[in-house]
């Protein structure tokens, strides 16, 4: 049995000729015929080469792997009970699901507070991020949860001003921070600025802290979609040259006269901008953390990807030793705005396995009374049941879940609906709910009451879409928690989920469902 689909995918806009008869190992048609125009990935690579490495079309899509891992979070079920309540009086009139508290506080001083136990954990310099930032920033701020400005935002900004080799002013980063802050209320939420190798060389964190007043900064080791640096596509020659001047790897060389001629005659239409891979050492990590604290950072986060177990151990150990405030662990499979497609599917430690190792490592340090940061886990999460399972799997160390593709989808849908309302071309599927923001978006009336008429009318529908999606997740999570009789997040435990297979139990250490409550059941039956 193969876990992977090879040589054909909607991600690369490729397909087989004999779609019903495929060789499972190569992904090739069982009869590869002379004269075929080459619609499969091999065939398309014969004429477009490296372009076919990446999902397409760039700039209007987000992407995640389609590989089916042997074990995933669907291999666990949530346990409910009829007895008692944790975090509230065991009273049927009090222990109702709207009373469930899903707020979370993190940070060395518990100074970061969020209405919801999830965050958007890195939206960077891709077009899909920039074009939907308004909805993502405002929606996140209104919901009172965190949003991370990802890597390369400053480096990609053509309007950045430099003075003596250091940033003196930005347009895009400043805009992104301001959009969030303008809608942040009562101190809930946080805007986080992330930095990779190139960002560090440009001193993005120092600028964000000292000039924009950003309190939360994140060191980026990697992400789940790839084990190389971030990349985007560039359609403008001058911008490609600018990025190379700023220290990025740009392919092909935008200053090569032959490349320029080929680009101008349309032989290719996009350059690739790549970031460098980091070189982690404890010494350099310690220096970076110390430098950020001296620059004025109040909270320091670390994000790591689906690297081998030793690197996960480094992330946990360094976060403990150097008092990091939040460690985010992103697992294999994506998502991304642009990453190599085969890499996304075939590298890294999958979610359940990575999160299980994370729990083991955190528990080991906790048993030694070592400091542990709050932990967030990523892994293709999109719904409340997955959030519950992830919090339970990593309890008591995992405090939040990181997401990106699902919130972007909600913001994009909200934006698109707004455009159809303005154009008076609402699709039938949507029109059955109404023909205005107030009728279509179920949270519109509460948002109008919260913001007032004037501010509500200015609210982008992308933000309403994200806020409404979050409202659904919040109610769904409260219902699941009430069913497990856990009325605040700190009461969720590993015993609140059960493994449906022996393999899932073996990997995670979560009890197999037939072994759950075995001793307690035996005692109850002694009547």
Residue ranges and their predicted role:
Residues 102-106, 158-189, 194-198, 422-456:
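A structural-propensity feature for long, helix-poor, extended segments
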Residues 395, 417-418, 422-424, 434-527:
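Catalytic or ion-coupling anion/metal-binding cores of large enzyme and transporter domains
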Residues 122, 127-319:
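Active-site-facing alpha/beta catalytic cores
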Residues 1-116, 128-141, 146, 158-189, ...:
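Conserved, well-structured core domains of diverse proteins
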Residues 150, 299-303, 368, 484-492:
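Flexible, glycine/charged-enriched surface loops at secondary-structure junctions
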Residues 263-449:
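Glycine-rich phosphate/ribose-binding loops and adjacent secondary-structure elements
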């Amino acid at each position: 049995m193969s876990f992977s689909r090879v040589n054909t995918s909607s991600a690369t806009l490729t397909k087989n000729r004999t779609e019903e008869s495929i060789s499972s190992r190569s992904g090739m048609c069982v009869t590869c015929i002379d004269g075929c125009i080459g619609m499969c990935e091999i065939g398309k690579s014969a004429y477009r080469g490296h372009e076919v490495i990446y999902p397409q079309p760039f700039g209007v899509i987000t992407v995640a792997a389609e590989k089916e891992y042997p074990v995933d979070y669907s291999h666990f079920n949530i346990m409910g009970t009829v007895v008692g309540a944790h975090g509230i009086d065991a009273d049927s009139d009090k222990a109702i699901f709207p009373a469930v508290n899903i707020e979370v506080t993190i940070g060395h001083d518990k100074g970061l507070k969020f209405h919801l136990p999830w965050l958007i954990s890195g939206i960077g310099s891709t077009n899909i991020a920039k074009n939907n930032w308004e909805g993502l920033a405002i929606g996140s701020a209104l919901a009172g949860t965190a949003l991370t400005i990802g890597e390369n935002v400053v480096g990609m900004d053509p309007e950045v001003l430099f003075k003596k080799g250091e940033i003196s002013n930005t347009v895009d980063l400043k805009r992104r921070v301001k959009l969030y802050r303008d809608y942040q209320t009562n101190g809930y939420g946080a805007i986080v600025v992330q930095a990779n190798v190139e960002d560090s060389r440009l001193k993005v964190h120092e600028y964000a802290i000292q000039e924009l007043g950003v309190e939360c900064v994140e060191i980026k080791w990697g992400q789940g979609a790839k084990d190389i640096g971030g990349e985007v596509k560039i359609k403008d020659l001058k911008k490609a040259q600018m990025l190379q001047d700023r220290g990025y790897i740009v392919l092909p060389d935008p200053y090569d006269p032959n490349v320029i001629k080929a680009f101008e005659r349309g032989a290719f239409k996009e350059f690739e901008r790549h970031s460098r891979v980091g070189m982690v050492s404890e010494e350099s990590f310690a220096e970076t953390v110390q430098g950020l604290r001296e620059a004025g950072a109040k909270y320091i986060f670390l994000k790591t990807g689906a690297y081998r177990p030793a690197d996960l151990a480094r992330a946990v150990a360094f976060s403990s030793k150097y008092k990091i405030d939040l460690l985010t662990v992103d697992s294999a499979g994506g998502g991304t705005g642009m990453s190599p497609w085969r890499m996304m599917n075939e590298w890294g430690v999958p979610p359940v396995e990575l999160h299980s190792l994370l729990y083991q490592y955190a528990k080991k340090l906790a048993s030694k009374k070592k400091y542990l940061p709050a932990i967030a886990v990523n892994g293709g999460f999109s719904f409340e049941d997955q959030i519950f399972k992830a919090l339970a799997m990593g309890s008591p160390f995992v405090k939040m879940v990181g997401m990106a593709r699902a919130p972007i989808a909600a913001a994009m849908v909200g934006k698109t609906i707004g455009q159809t309302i303005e154009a008076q071309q609402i699709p039938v599927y949507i029109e059955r709910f109404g023909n205005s923001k107030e009728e279509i978006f179920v949270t519109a009336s509460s948002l109008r009451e919260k913001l007032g008429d004037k501010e509500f009318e200015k609210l982008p529908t992308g933000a309403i879409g994200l806020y409404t999606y979050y409202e659904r997740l919040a109610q769904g999570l409260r219902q699941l928690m009430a069913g497990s009789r856990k009325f605040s997040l700190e009461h969720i435990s590993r015993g609140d989920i059960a493994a449906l297979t022996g393999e899932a139990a073996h990997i995670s250490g979560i009890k197999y469902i037939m072994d759950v409550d075995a001793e307690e059941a035996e005692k109850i039956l002694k009547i």
